[in-house]
Amino acid sequence: MKITDVKVNRRRVNLHTPFKTALRTVTEIESIDVYIHTDEGVIGKGAAAATPVITGDFANGIEEAILGPMRSCLIGQDIIQFQQLLQHIQMSCIGNPSAKAAVDIALYDVYCQHQNVPLYALLGGKKEIHTDITVSVDEPFIMAKEAKQHVEKGFQTLKIKVGKSAHLDLERIEAIRNSVPKNTTLRLDANQGWNRKEAVTIIKEMENRNLNIEFIEQPVHAKDWDGLKYVKDHVQTPIMADESIFSASDALKIVQGGYADLLNIKLMKCGGIREAWRIADIAETAGVKCMVGSMMESSLSVSAVAHLAAAHPNIHYFDLDAPLWLMEEPEGMTYSGSKVNLQSTVNSKS
């Protein structure tokens, strides 16, 4: 089965409500969908999301990388050389992790169809996945109301966005904790919004108030690894690296240096399933648990993350709610409350 063409389609999808973090406010996404065509009529699908504030990738650049160097190294190649093709994509250009992720996902889809197995089976596992759901940063009473609504819909784990205004963050979390049942799990994401001393002060106060926070993502700037370690070493609540980790190389440095307690893996940061698996493996050797998440992106890419999460034994936490924010999504994932339903392939419903 040989690859005959690589095509791209760009589409915009509105969100039900604005998605607000310490870094940005999102009202719509632009999905860059990738289609790898073969001489046997099989078409593999993948997708990328432009998130320049995190990855540095813009939609035009993603499209150009896919239709330029990545397409060139795939045309005429046989899918039986699957592992080599994945490597060629990573070596085709510097950076561009989102474009690489989209093509990586599409290659996996072609290969799964060639082997007639779903992605989770190809990767070697299928555990049940329940996602958290995000509460955007806002006024405390608005966040508390939103949190209560999510719990009423069956979500037991809430991911709370903080970091936009430190003096309000304690009030936000306390309002949410008081509005939901005690057994509701709360995890926080500061999206780089605090400095190291500010983070320690806020987290210690949360601990003193017994707010029972499961873990806190990226409290400080992505490049402030020393600050990340400082926070980790001065609080009891586990600290998760997110924007600080893009690659398996980053993962190795973080676990060797003890910079974080946990790692958050995203395909748009690391460049695809292959590199994500390597990150989870490296973390596992150091006894560091991983979460998988996504940017604000479409079902085509998030469903690939779900299959990865179902298969890898060191992925323990799941943040896969992005498609639930979209007003319309013609194909991809389905949910039963917080449960993520895995499809028979990356791009089709079961």
Positions of PLM-derived features:
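Structured beta-strand/loop patches that form or line metal/cofactor-binding pockets in enzymes
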Residues: 1-45, 49-53, 326-327
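Catalytic core of soluble alpha/beta enzymes
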Residues: 160, 167-301, 327-338
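Metal- or metallocofactor-binding catalytic centers and their adjacent structured scaffolds
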Residues: 5-7, 37-114
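Active-site mouth loops of central-metabolism enzymes
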Residues: 128-142, 190-191, 195-196, 240
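Conserved, mostly hydrophobic/aromatic
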Residues: 3, 34, 41, 70, ...
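Flexible C-terminal active-site loop/helix
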Residues: 4-15, 29-31, 295-350
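Glycine-rich phosphate/pyrophosphate-binding beta-alpha loops
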Residues: 48-56, 130, 134-138, 294
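N-terminal small/glycine-rich loop or linker at the start of catalytic domains
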Residues: 113-136
